[in-house]
């Protein structure tokens, strides 16, 4: 795709200050450092990570991912490392593809493995659903791939200055026309249902809409691109855990001459007219810069911008659903008896559309899922070195994620609800065949909407603004801040949106707003 002109900050910038050492901040820093910029990251936590961090078990007995567990498009990590002449080998980062990407279990007792290899997946669909559905799977895969290929360069991995950018040239117009012809602005659930008949496969190829904060029945067809990433491009996992990604990116930045200040919270921005001149810390220290990238959650970012000339958008935001997550360990002698032996297992409840309505209901109308679909993640199966020692034998790491309504949809008293809901979920898994999980799963960390709200995340969700049409593409919160000359946003609240790949891209797009590089 030909490079198009984009607006950049108003003046050249050699010194760039980045607030936040998560994926977007580190991605931006590496791309900027690769152009010779003097880059400083300021991070309030004691280590890099953000939404890709880690918890420590009791006494430091293990480390388990505290955020994202699904990695797709690892080439974006390579791209960021390459910006400063580094690579995975240099940083000690080892990434392995999962096979299967997911193991799907259904309420009727059947299972379907999800493979990125087309032949392997076709064989699995034929086994589980019959020959006719295997043929239809190939048609669906082609449609998902066409959707991804049509939108990626122009609509995902590019900066927008205006909705007019969607059709501001003959090539852009052609891409938009093709996106419309593919059904990109109809509903994802409807488009998938046109191509495959088995309700289990429909779930496998549409549940990813929840990553974008939308039920499959209401998500736009363009979000078939997420399903393509998940089911065709492959799911991966780094040795040692997802947090190894941010550790590797941070190490590459330091080696390239960048700097990171940990345990340092930015609480203000100084300005002269419309130019931000320095970030100020909670201790009162000044960190001057020529340009600033803010990667925090939107409420925190807007609080920083509130005392500057920045024009903060006032329109109401619709927030994504949240999550309730249990982290801990369980004896391998228990898990070894389970039928499911996969890194990621999606254990689908019988209900489907009704559970999404519970999760995404309007203000005050939401509830927890009455028949939950759950993500069970067992990283030790892929990275055995992560195993924890137990008094009676080795214990594997285990995370159980239940989608949950956000605090706007359902202002639940999670402090009181957490113990009973934890017991309810473990009881559900016990009945579904995960024998011993109620008794033997030592839960060391519980995350709920209360957790995310305490960290400054709006509506108590780590998934930020939902990808409804008014919050998608050029209609999403713009990364170039109006009213000030030299501030750019990055992270899941701005373009292109939520997810590990898109957050990495947002960092690169923020860097481009400073350098003007394509």
Where are these predicted regions, by residue range?
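A conserved FAD-binding loop/helix module that cradles the flavin
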Residues: 68, 492-515
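Extreme N-terminal leader/targeting segments of oxidoreductases
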Residues: 1-16, 34-35, 468-472
């Amino acid at each position: 795709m030909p490079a198009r002109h984009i607006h950049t900050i108003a003046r050249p910038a050699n010194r760039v200050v980045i607030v936040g050492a998560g994926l977007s901040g580190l991605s931006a820093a590496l791309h900027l450092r690769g152009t010779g910029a003097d880059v400083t990251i300021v991070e309030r936590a004691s280590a890099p990570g953000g939404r890709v961090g880690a918890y420590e078990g009791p006494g430091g007995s293990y480390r388990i991912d505290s955020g994202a567990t699904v990695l797709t498009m690892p080439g974006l990590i390579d791209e960021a490392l390459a910006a400063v002449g580094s690579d995975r080998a240099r940083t000690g980062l080892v990434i392995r593809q999962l096979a299967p990407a997911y193991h799907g279990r259904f309420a009727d007792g059947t299972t379907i493995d999800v493979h990125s290899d087309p032949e392997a997946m076709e064989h699995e669909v034929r086994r589980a659903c019959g020959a006719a559905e295997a043929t239809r799977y190939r048609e669906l895969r082609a449609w998902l791939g066409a959707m991804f290929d049509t939108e990626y360069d122009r609509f995902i991995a590019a900066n927008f200055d205006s909705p007019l950018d969607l059709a501001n040239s003959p090539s852009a117009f052609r891409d938009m026309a093709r996106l419309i012809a593919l059904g990109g602005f109809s509903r994802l659930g409807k488009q998938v249902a046109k191509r495959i008949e088995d309700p289990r496969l429909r779930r496998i190829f549409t549940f990813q809409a929840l990553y974008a904060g939308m039920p499959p029945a209401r998500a736009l067809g363009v979000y078939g691109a997420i399903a393509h990433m998940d089911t065709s491009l492959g799911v991966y996992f780094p040795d040692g855990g997802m947090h190894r990604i941010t550790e590797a990116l941070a190490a590459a930045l330091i080696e390239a001459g960048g700097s990171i200040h940990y345990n340092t919270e930015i609480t203000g921005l100084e300005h002269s007219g419309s130019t931000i001149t320095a970030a100020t810390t909670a201790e009162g220290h000044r960190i001057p810069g020529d340009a600033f990238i803010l990667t925090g959650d939107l409420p925190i970012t807007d609080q920083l911008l509130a005392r500057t000339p920045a024009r903060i958008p006032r329109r109401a935001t619709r927030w994504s659903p949240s999550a309730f997550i249990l982290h801990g360990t369980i004896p391998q002698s228990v898990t070894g008896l389970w039928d499911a032996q996969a890194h990621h297992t999606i254990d689908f409840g019988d209900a489907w559309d009704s559970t999404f309505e519970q999760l995404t209901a309007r203000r005050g109308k939401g509830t927890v899922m009455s028949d939950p679909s759950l993500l069970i993640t067992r990283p030790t199966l892929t990275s055995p070195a992560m195993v924890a020692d137990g008094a009676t034998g080795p214990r594997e790491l285990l995370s159980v994620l239940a989608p949950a309504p956000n605090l706007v949809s359902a202002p639940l008293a999670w402090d009181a609800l957490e113990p009973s809901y934890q017991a309810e979920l473990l009881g559900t898994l016990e009945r579904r065949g995960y024998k011993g999980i109620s008794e033997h799963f030592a839960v060391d960390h519980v995350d709920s909407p209360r957790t995310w709200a305490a960290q400054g995340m709006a509506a108590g969700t780590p998934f930020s603004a939902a990808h409804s049409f008014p919050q998608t593409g050029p209609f999403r919160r713009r990364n170039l801040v109006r009213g000030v000359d030299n501030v750019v946003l990055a992270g899941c609240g701005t373009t292109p949106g939520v997810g590990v790949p898109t957050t990495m891209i947002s960092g690169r797009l923020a860097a481009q707003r400073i350098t003007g590089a394509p």
